[in-house]
């Protein structure tokens, strides 16, 4: 049984790609048709590739892989943080800092500074410092938490990276590829899929679509870690939907 049903994908709008003029021709094989100037993603492939992504992430988690979720666009930020946390993994959901992976030593120093500031507050150091200095420390902590809070406890460079919108996260993807880190990604019709190891063709601009796919990969991690079925966020629907039904839905939505 597929980990995500066609019905779920349709309900969350996963099939809607970008305007045809914004497409990347390399995504042609994942496009089913075009309706009213919008590319429609072939959800039969999405179902199959989501299964592959699930199995890959589950098996990686079973081998204690460190998995980093990346999604800095506003539609992805909340789901990326929530689902990575639920799965006991790590995330970056604000701006990707260049060198986060390729200059990991420097990033670790910034994380150490964040932990130091937190420790100063916990130990009461803030109580004896001038208010102006405390304000500066709080400002520094807030900035560090914003960009690095999701990887504060990441023990090492990740073994796998999951990305929402590799078109936007090109720097992150390039760093991962440079280090040989496999990338699983939601890839829309405007993106270049070449650097992605496991492609999930999907609308990466709809919050519900991002939540559906991201939650399913979090389920995969939980299952891999527990060695049993996860308490899944989205129940699989066994009802099969034909490709013709997809067209009917798309035409209805674009009418």
From Swiss-Prot:
Encoding gene per record: rpsB
Molecular function as annotated in GO: structural constituent of ribosome
Family, similarity comment: Belongs to the universal ribosomal protein uS2 family.
Cross-referenced InterPro entries: Ribosomal_uS2, Ribosomal_uS2_bac/mit/plastid, Ribosomal_uS2_CS, Ribosomal_uS2_flav_dom_sf
Protein name: Small ribosomal subunit protein uS2
Matching NCBIfam families: rpsB_bact
Keywords assigned by UniProt, alphabetized: Ribonucleoprotein, Ribosomal protein
Highest taxon listed in the record's lineage: Bacteria
GO cellular component: cytosolic small ribosomal subunit
Cysteine pairs bridged by disulfides in the record: none
A biological process from GO: translation
